[in-house]
Structure formats: structure tokens, C-alpha cells
């Protein structure tokens, strides 16, 4: 019997008929029309349909008669008819179609029935019928007064319809009306398990999100569905406002813990940025192998937990979290890929490819400037490889080819080459600490900090070496040591380091630059922790400075330090914004905007982006009016204003849009379009910031449309736009060895051969493109682009905010700020270990990641894959999965360091 109700004639003769004329319709006005229609319809109906229609009409009439003993069998028959027809998915089931015109009559009959079982039974049937009528949630109304028999018997479509009505009804009830919500809740408790059991997990989640009862999920979830449910919940996070987004994450986290999926739970705890929870998850896991995997994840995210000594395998876990092995694992990858051979800058510039051989004439324009560029390029390209051809053999020769501040950056680049190699690196840097030149000494101090970036060491070598120079008489020495400490302890929130640095800001000998760098360093160390001491000290420093001092370009680093301290903290910044109200313009709006955008970094908060767009547009009108008055006067005024005005807050607003939107794909796409408009119509300060924003939204992800835009603006009439565009090209392609970008940059190098500043930028971009010979990334997102590393964002922001005044900072004397990028450098590799942490080469498939949220079954998660043997490199947007069933990964996301276990069910 369970058939029929297909598009054409149903198989069983009895099926629900269209109405006969005169079947008490609610609206008599439409009745005549319908009668005519029915006449036509009756002609078309097949025998079986006709029979079905008559039968249903008879049943309805029977319900209208006085004889109550006939009600029960009539209702039974109606129900059987409706149920037996719900098998078809493509069309409205015939019985429902034929009963529609009787809907009003059935309701009347229901009202006149005596209370009791029959009345409830009738309510059930009307409830199902209501699904086809667009009424005022009558499906729900009659369901609640019906016989409460199980939902499943009426089919999936009915359950879906009901769920929609429950959600709407819930939103109309106030919190006060608790009693009315009770029956709805009981319904929900039926709907959710039904959906879970029928592959409609996301519908269950949607319903619970609508009625804000997500916590109910945990009870109804089973082994098969939890992965899908959690994937759906976490992918909804970007689209719901505070505080619901954290509620969703906490719910998914609870589900993972229920099934002892610790690595997944840990990842969500890191997304929530809740350190107590992280520690709780880590310590509650009793499986040492899983703990090691979680330690790798924490190390990658830059989180260090103080474990008690009695934890099993304490030393191993501490070592993994401290990233002690990062350098040796990275070098193992380099040997595997056969790229250990050091490169010199000329290998990158490929000067031999330039046709008119003006490598000579170009480099004579500003030889110190070119040598400085080569120092950076050499550092970027050989980063973390531990050897190069300029500095590690006989560095002095190279250092003295640089002048003054150039020596500082050149010496510091040694730190980049020895990145993460604390034991071996410091001995090589040591000899420069005794140099007679302050600049070289300061650079060596910075190098010590860089080497320790992202790596913990119980001996704290960076603190020991650098602490003596923090209040040194020479401001040059202060710069190197303070910025070095900032990089070495970024994200650690170490009180001892902060107490050492904070007094420097108020010290009378500190120049504005030193005060700025100190604020920066403190912001990096306390990143995202809302550290009270850091906040109060920086605020106090800002208050104490005079208006002219705040016009100094280095003053921009003070609010940046504040912003980094509150990175991603959302509303926690209200008090600071209030405190900044007393500062004079233009510094106030600059600081306010900067702190504000940092607080929402990576959140994808649409409302914030709208506010920032207002900031970008508001300024424009007022200037336009002036322009009409007197263009000439405006030009002169602009020239005078430019250095004093801090590139105002508009530049920051543009960067902020990128900073907020980079967290999720759709927001980033929309931001891209906006940037296009800003580049065409914006003020000069705005246009200078747009290339930097493009760089931030697509770090280490060389998308052609972005590269083309940047390439176009690298020839802009405004030199600062072109400097920033060229550098942005380097950021977008950082660590990718992208051939198309490399070719673009070589052409630019020829085009700008006579312009030392632009050429300097081209060289930097070339160095970044080949960062770590193509093995490193600057992208702050990891774990399938779910987690944002705050330390990495801090490093990127430091550099980009400094580029807002590229002429005075980067092309001036403070190019050492570029080493902020070190905080974001991470190997983009996948290395697999066995349970004893020995390298274990296995074959993996690497391909473009596919979004599988809310899809049924087990869809493929990657497309267009190639099979490699680990260790392998993963490009932006790629995902890996094991190509063998012999091993099972301990964590579902294959990225960074992954521990594999033997599959017990694997038979050889």
C-alpha cells in the first residue's frame, strides 16, 4: 500500500479527490470560480483519481453527519490515505491536493466535535492539511491540540514545515510567556532527534539556533552525526552576532568532548581564545599521544601552558609546545626537497635576464640603499636555513658595505637566517655584540630576539642578553634590544619582560621612536590579553606627550601597541576609547580607529566594516567643497599639511576593513570590491592604504585579480601608492615562489632602475616572494584557515601600519620594522610522525580544499589532488588527506606536525 501519490495516477484506487461543488468552502466568493474549475478538472481526472476524490468527499461528509460512531473509522481512513501517499517527493500528494477545498469545512467540523480522542485525531489531520494552505501557522496550532502521536509517521516534509512554524512562533513569544513556550519545547524535543536520525543534522541545528536552545544538541547527537553537526555549527559562527557565535562554538566544543575528540575541542577553545578551557581540555586528556598532538597544535598557535612537573612525559610535551624542534624539522624538510644550497640576492633578482645589462648603472645610483635591500632579501630568502653566502662566513665585510641604520638591519638579518635555532644561532651572533659600532651591536641584539621568535627556552637567552640594553644611553641600542624582546616574547604575556620594558616609555632620554617601539613591543608580548599595565602605561605616555610630539610619525606606534594588547577582544575597548577622548585631533581619531579595528580583527563583523566605510567616505565631502572654493589654495595647504597630518585615520580605516574581513571568504570578496572603488575615488591617504589592505586580505595567497590590481598601481603617479603596491605584491606572494609574480617584479625592477626608492621596494618584494626559498608563509590563519594566530597578525600589522608613512619610516631610518614579519613566518609544511615522534613518510593526497558543510553522505573534501610522500608543502587553500589506510591521523586536519597511529583494522 505504501505507494501511489506519484505524478500521474496513483496506484491505489482510493486517493484524495478534488472537491465536489458545494463542499463548504470558507470563502463563498471564490466558490463559483472553483466550481467551474472543478468541472474541468473532473474531465481530466483518471478513473482512479475520480474514485479517490469521491471517497475522500464521502469521508468528509460522514464527519459532518450526526452519527458520532462513524467518526472514528472515517478519520482512520483519512489518515491512512494521507500517509500512504507521502512517499512522493516531487509533487503535492494527491490526498492533500483533493482535500484542500474541504479545509474550511474540516475546521468547522473540528470546532463542533465533542472534546475527546476523535477531536484530537481530527486536529492531527487538519495539521497535516494546513501544510498545503498558507495560513497563520495553523499546522502548529492544530499539532499542539492533536493526539501527540509521533511526528515521524507523517513524513519528513511535515516535520520540516512544522520546524519552520515553531521557529516563527517562538520569536513572537516574549521571554515572559514561559508557559506558552513549554509545548513548543516538547515539540522541538521530538523534531531534533528525528532530523538527526534522517541526515538532516543542519536542519536540527537551524531550528535550535532560531530558538536559542543550541545546548539541547548534546543529548540527541550520536557517533555518526557529531562531526557533521560540529562542522555546521562552526561554519555558522561567522554569520551570527556576539554572543551567539561563542555559544555555537561552546556547544560544538561540548559535543567534541562528549565523544573524546580532544584535538577538535582544543581547536575550538583556541578560537574562543579561552586559556582556562584550553588548559582544562589539555589536562583532561589521558592519552599521551593525543596530548602530544595537542602540544603541536598549541606550539603552532603560539600558546604555552605551564604544566605541572608530574604530568606524564612532561619534558616531551613542554619541548613540543616550546617549538624547540621547529628548526630541525624544518631543515629535514629542506633536505628532503633538496633546497639547502644558500642563495644570494642575485639568484633572486636574476640580473642576467635584464637585457640592457644595467645592473651596473642601476646599482650605482644609491649603492648603500641597494646593499640594504640585498641584506633584507638575503635574510628573507635564506630564512631559517642557517647558512647564507653574505653573513655567516665573513659577515663584517658585508656589514661595512652598509651605512648607519643600514648596518642595524643588515646585522639583524643574521637573526632571520638563523631563525628558530636558539642554541646554534646565538653563538654565531655573539661576536657582533662586541662590535665598536653601536648600529651593528644594536642589530645583533635585534638578531638575538629574532632567533628566539616563536621558540621557548627555559634559559631565556633573549631576556638575559637584551635586558641590559633596554635603558642604554644610546637610543640606537635601545631600539634593537626592545624590538628584539618584543619579537622573542611575542604572545607570551610574560610579566618579567613587560616590567622591564614599560618604564622605557616614560624615560626622559627615550626619543619618540624608542617610546613607539616600546609600545609596539609591549603590544606584541601582551597581544590579545588586555593587560592592564600595558594599557595604562601607553595611555599615560600618550597623555603626557605634547601636541607636536604626537605629530611625530613614530607616535602611530603608541596606539598600535594599545590595539595589539586588545587584539580580537571586541567590546573590551570601550574604556580606552573613552580615555582617548581627551587627546587632540588628528591623533585622537587615528588612535581611536586603530584600537577599534584591532579589537575586531578577523571577526568578520559587518557592522564595524560599515562604520569604517563611513570613515572612508565622510572626509571626502568636506574636502570636495573646499576644492570648489579654491583649488590652488588647497594644493598649497595640502603640501604643508601632509607631514603634520598623520595620514589621518582614513588609512587605518581601510586597513581595518581588511583586518576585520580577512576572517571569512565572503567578507573578503566584498571588501575587495570596495577597495577597487576606494582606489579610484579616494583621497591620497586612502589610496596609499588600499594596496596594504589588499596585501592583508590575501597574505601568501597570490590571486591573479589582486596581483593585477597591484601591478597597475605600482606605476601610479603618487609615489607612495606605488611603493606600497610593490611591497604589497611581495606580501601577497610571500613564500610562494610564484613565477608570474617573479616575472612582474623583474619587469618593475627594470622600469624603476633609476629610482632608488621604488627599486628598494621591488627588491623587498622579490625577497618576500622567495621567502624561505618558497617554504614559509606569512598567512596568520592555520588549521584549515580556522584559527587566527594573534602573534602573526601583530607582526603583520606592525609592518603595515608603519607603511602608512612609508617615506619616513621604511624608506627613512626605521626599516628594521620589517622584521616584524618574523612573527608571522611559519613553515607551510605537513610532517608526519609515528607515536614515538620519529618522522614517518607516508603517501598523502594534496589538493584544493572543498567546502563540504551541510552535504549528505561522505563527500570528497579535496579536488584535483596529487599524491606525494610526506613531508610536503601545502599552498594556500590546499588540504591534505592520507592516501593509505594503514595509519590513522590523531587530528582530522592534516597541517603542520601530525602524529599517525597504526590502523588496528588494517590488514596487509
UniProtKB/Swiss-Prot annotation:
UniProt protein name: 26S proteasome non-ATPase regulatory subunit 2
Gene3D superfamilies to which the protein is assigned, alphabetical: Leucine-rich Repeat Variant (1.25.10.10)
Origin organism lineage: Eukaryota, Metazoa, Chordata, Craniata, Vertebrata
GO function terms (MF aspect): enzyme regulator activity
Region (Required for interaction with UBLCP1): 708-903
Pfam families attached to this UniProt entry: PC_rep, RPN1_C, RPN1_RPN2_N
Keyword Acetylation: yes
Complex and partners: Component of the 19S proteasome regulatory particle complex. The 26S proteasome consists of a 20S core particle (CP) and two 19S regulatory subunits (RP). The regulatory particle is made of a lid composed of 9 subunits, a base containing 6 ATPases and few additional components including PSMD2. Interacts with RPGRIP1L. Interacts with CRY1 in a KDM8-dependent manner.
